[in-house]
Amino acid sequence: MAKITQTMISQLLAAVGGSSNVSKCGNCMTRLRLTLANNGVADQAVIKQIPGVMGVVESDEQFQIILGPGKAQQAAELMNKLIESVINGDVQEQAIASDTNDLSSVAAEQKKQMKSKQTSAVQRFLSKFATIFTPLIPGFIAAGLLLGFATLLEQMFVLEQTPSQFMLDLIAYMKVFGKGLFAFLSILIGYNAQQAFGGSGVNGAILASLFVLGYNPDATSGIYSGMSEFFGYTIDPRGNIIGVLLAAIIGAQVERKVREYMPDDLDMILTSVVTLLIMGVITFVVIMPIGGELFKGMSWLFLNLNDNPLGAAILAGLFLISVVFGIHQGFVPVYFALMEAQGFNSLFPILAMAGGGQVGASLALYFKAKKDAVLRTQVKGAIIPGILGIGEPLIYGVTLPRVKPFVTACIGGAAGGFFIGLVSYLGLPVGLNTVFGPSGIVAIPLMTSHSGIFAGMAVFVVGLLISYVVGFLATYFFGSKDVDLS
């Protein structure tokens, strides 16, 4: 696979319209995420031809270039440095060939932009969740792995035994990071959410803290807020992450509106004061009760879907489509709801089966292709990341361009999801021990259940194997006919 080089980044920057067209450059684990002033200037055909680019996902809010695991962060760092150098005049930007004076071209471009705005409102909204949660993913994974290893040590050396003090201290030490993360996670999310929707992150963090504080003066744990009611109105800090997101999203809009009317000289002093006073009322009186009901409803819906084999199959089968459109981060609030309701994330292993279907489908294409086929080289380069839970190289490099294998990969994922849902229906729900984590075989140590981690790990492994096998067979016999295997 192509390395990330200065030349490649220069080509990408030129193809997206130059530094003047890039408002913001960031990344997630596998994608370079750009906020462009005008998406229509970007030449997708040229971008896709640049070595190392696996695909492009476009929305009105973000222009996502898929580069694969371990490359997106490096690309973002290089591009930000290049943009800074161009702005400072240290380097000359690569010329962009674009005929913007042609009236028909301008009209066509405007039509494209308007159509995007009309058809992708949900996609634009959900894409912001990537901005909110992607920076937190490494912490989720680290805390989850440490908790998984701590639980494993606990079951092997503590339960029904007389453990050493060192072992008890080690287990407590490995667990403390997860406790710290989840104790203040709402504040981190509030900060990111308000910032993502155009407000000040610190205001979002303060609003989120209203859900963390305690309102019972007799409570023996937590931080007492100093108030038990709001002007005679009982405070019930329900809603968890749903309430925090609602408060931050609405708070960003309120802050922007306040700033419109606030004199520049007073902006630094009063904008946040007015925003917090307004949002405090809205949060205590409206958002907390509504957020609580939404949180309960979301938990009930997905608990019932997860415990239903058909529901689980549908969720797993459709998940790859959400990845293609870049809206899969929209499931993260659901993960929080399930963590609150069950103590683990029972949706994640179901959705992870989609990656297993990709692996099986890609292996089938490998065996169907001739020994000297380019397809075999593509599969070789992407199959290991796929097994480890990073499926985008397989999606954009192998199955999606050939369409039929993508469909049969979804079928493989649905089969694995059906199995996970069936086991849950029979009384053994399994899930991730943290909100978010890696999928594929890397997720095995993070699996748990009410019957312990070994049962959770076993169910997950069997589900993955089913996804591999069904994805392979469906593709080998049905998904490779009339498909380019060169």
UniProtKB/Swiss-Prot annotation:
It is an enzyme of class 2 (transferase). Its EC number is 2.7.1.192. It is a multi-pass membrane protein. GO terms for cellular component: plasma membrane. The chain crosses the membrane at residues 129-149, 170-190, 196-216, 230-250, 268-288, 312-332, 347-367, 381-401, 411-431, 453-473. SUPFAM superfamilies: Glucose permease domain IIB. InterPro entries: Glu_permease_IIB, PTrfase_EIIB_Cys, PTS_EIIC, PTS_EIIC_1, PTS_IIB_1, PTS_Sugar-Specific_Components. GO terms for molecular function: kinase activity; protein-N(PI)-phosphohistidine-sugar phosphotransferase activity; protein-phosphocysteine-N-acetylmuramate phosphotransferase system transporter activity. The active site is at C28 (phosphocysteine intermediate). Residues 127-486 form the PTS EIIC type-1 domain. It catalyses: N-acetyl-beta-D-muramate(out) + N(pros)-phospho-L-histidyl-[protein] = N-acetyl-beta-D-muramate 6-phosphate(in) + L-histidyl-[protein]. Residues 1-89 form the PTS EIIB type-1 domain. The phosphoenolpyruvate-dependent sugar phosphotransferase system (sugar PTS), a major carbohydrate active transport system, catalyzes the phosphorylation of incoming sugar substrates concomitantly with their translocation across the cell membrane. This system is involved in N-acetylmuramic acid (MurNAc) transport, yielding cytoplasmic MurNAc-6-P. Is also able to take up anhydro-N-acetylmuramic acid (anhMurNAc), but cannot phosphorylate the carbon 6, probably because of the 1,6-anhydro ring. Gene3D superfamilies: Glucose permease domain IIB (3.30.1360.60). This is PTS system N-acetylmuramic acid-specific EIIBC component. One of its GO terms (biological process) is phosphoenolpyruvate-dependent sugar phosphotransferase system. Keywords: Cell inner membrane, Cell membrane, Kinase, Membrane, Phosphotransferase system, Sugar transport, Transferase, Transmembrane, Transmembrane helix, Transport. The keyword Membrane applies. It is found in: Cell inner membrane. The EIIB domain is phosphorylated by phospho-EIIA on a cysteinyl or histidyl residue, depending on the transported sugar. Then, it transfers the phosphoryl group to the sugar substrate concomitantly with the sugar uptake processed by the EIIC domain. Signal peptide: none annotated.
